[in-house]
Amino acid sequence: MAAPGGHYSHAVTANGFVFISGQLPITPDGSKLADAPFEQQAEQTLNNVAMALTAAGSSLDRLVQVRVYVTDIKSWPAFNAIYAKWVGSSRPARAVIPVPELHYGFKIEVEAVALAG
């Protein structure tokens, strides 16, 4: 995955949990998908969450909470379908929060908390 864009880590482990910083639709080579359709942005963002979890020694089935920020709440049905396929049978706590805008003009950002190990 691409290096963090600021003074932070993609993932931090503390007290048995892995905290995943807000992930954006940026490809591993650093390409920003701001002009891509929402669905493509969502898939890349969730892939970044999965990569950060793996790098921290955790996995999707250990997710506890997921926070999703979207710039258009009308994207909720599309996101929910992509998310359900991505997370599988796991059902962590989740919030989808509409926001007026995100960095670089992205349409989605996702942060998460998982159990370590």
Q: Where are the language model's segments positioned?
A:
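Short, polar/acidic, helix-capping and beta-turn segments at strand->helix junctions
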Residues: 1-117
